[in-house]
Curated annotation (Swiss-Prot):
The keyword Methyltransferase does not apply. This is Adenine deaminase. CDD domains: ADA (cd01320). Belongs to the metallo-dependent hydrolases superfamily. Adenosine and AMP deaminases family. Adenine deaminase type 2 subfamily. It is an enzyme of class 3 (hydrolase). Binds 1 zinc ion per subunit. The active site is at 207 (proton donor). The lineage of its organism: Bacteria, Pseudomonadati, Pseudomonadota, Betaproteobacteria, Burkholderiales. Its EC number is 3.5.4.2. Its cofactor is Zn(2+). It catalyses: adenine + H2O + H(+) = hypoxanthine + NH4(+). It comes from Ralstonia nicotianae (strain ATCC BAA-1114 / GMI1000). InterPro entries: A_deaminase_dom, ADE, Ado/ade_deaminase, Metal_Hydrolase. The record marks 228 as: Important for catalytic activity.
Length: 345
């Protein structure tokens, strides 16, 4: 049963934190085409409509193939600025007040786009967003798991000068790309090095991979947050562990439906995980490719699963509690969330 218009409005206007957003995955077809034209890049699509037609993927790999083709238009600092500024505009419109944004340097350095170009453009846009909108943000550098451990180490070393400068907003590392055949332990030594450097640790696990990958991300990589994690529902002991530890799951329902992790949003495990006491949070993943930014994901999920106002309050609180913000900042945002939801009860 669809939620009421009143609840939909409360959800849309609620403060939120977005913790699972790939900045390259926010590249809309219109901007992709504009950047291709600006940079003289030939795309394998004749029109914006052809790109949108290509969005009928069947699995994670077919999505990734399109994702990396789209990234080929990103060549200059201004390109990264424009992409990031476009994401921020969408996030601000959805009442996202804080975002911890993934970026994939290997996608760009492999194309001979220097690290300073990637980080420089993204950070400049985030600095402008903070000044213009009070938009709070941090960056999480993600390693591509289909590449080698050695490549990840090389990327970490190249990024260290940027990581060590707080002005660049990089607070942690993550692990993304193809799960199949690339278990967490492949990057155990890389994550140990990152932990020694004092970086926050997250990893994609339990999306297309099994519940065991969630366990391995926790035990071997020692992550503080699990990105996706929906296959945890297949292991009752793991669900109990996640609920007890309050290690957050950054769940992306429209992404899961689009990539056939679940055949239909009504089959999604989010409500089961939430009802079991897990620290579930709700995000957009790659919104340009999966058909929705934050509010679209929230509203679609609430309509499909019949979630309540109390669930919305919990999910909004969880998003800030699971963030890597300083405790005093978390407290301010949690208070804002409580005021918003209690005003409507």
């Amino acid at each position: 049963m669809p939620i009421s218009p009143a609840l939909a409005e409360r959800i849309a206007t609620s403060p939120k934190a977005e913790l699972h957003i790939h900045i390259e995955g926010s590249l809309e077809p219109e901007l992709m085409f504009a950047l291709a034209e600006r940079n003289g890049v030939k795309l394998p699509y004749a029109s914006v409509d052809e790109v949108r037609a290509a969005y009928a993927f069947n699995d994670l790999q077919s999505f990734l193939d399109l994702y990396y083709a789209g990234a080929s238009v990103l060549l200059t600092e201004q390109d990264f600025y424009d992409m990031t500024a476009a994401y921020v505009a969408r996030a601000v419109a959805d009442n996202v007040r804080h975002a911890e944004i993934f970026f994939d340097p290997q996608t760009h350095t492999a194309r001979d786009v220097p690290m300073h170009v990637v980080i420089g453009g993204i950070v400049r846009a985030l600095d402008d967003a903070e000044r213009a909108h009070g938009f709070s943000s941090r960056l999480i550098l993600c390693f591509l798991r289909h590449l080698s451990e050695a490549d990840a180490f090389d990327t970490l070393e190249a990024a260290l000068p940027y990581i060590q400068d707080p002005a660049n907003r990089i607070i942690g590392v993550g692990l993304d790309s193809s799960e199949r055949g690339n278990p967490p332990e492949k990057f155990a030594r890389v994550f140990a090095r990152c932990k020694a450097l004092g970086l926050r640790l997250v990893a994609h696990a339990g999306e297309e991979g099994p519940a065991q990958y969630v366990i391995d991300a926790l035990d071997i990589l020692q992550v503080e947050r699990i990105d996706h994690g929906v296959r945890a529902i297949d292991d009752a002991a793991l669900v109990k562990r996640l609920a007890a530890s309050r290690v957050a799951l950054t769940v992306c329902p429209l992404s899961n439906e689009k990539l056939k992790v679940y055949p239909d949003l009504r089959d999604h495990s989010l409500k089961q995980l939430l009802d079991a006491g897990c620290a579930v949070t709700l995000h957009s993943d790659d919104p340009a490719y999966f058909g929705g930014y934050m509010n679209t994901n929230w509203l679609a999920t609430f309509n499909a699963l019949g979630l309540s106002a109390a669930d919305a309050h919990t999910l909004a609180r969880n998003s800030f509690e699971a963030s890597f913000l300083p405790e005093q900042d978390k407290a301010l945002w949690l208070n804002a969330v409580d005021i918003h939801w209690r005003a409507h009860t």
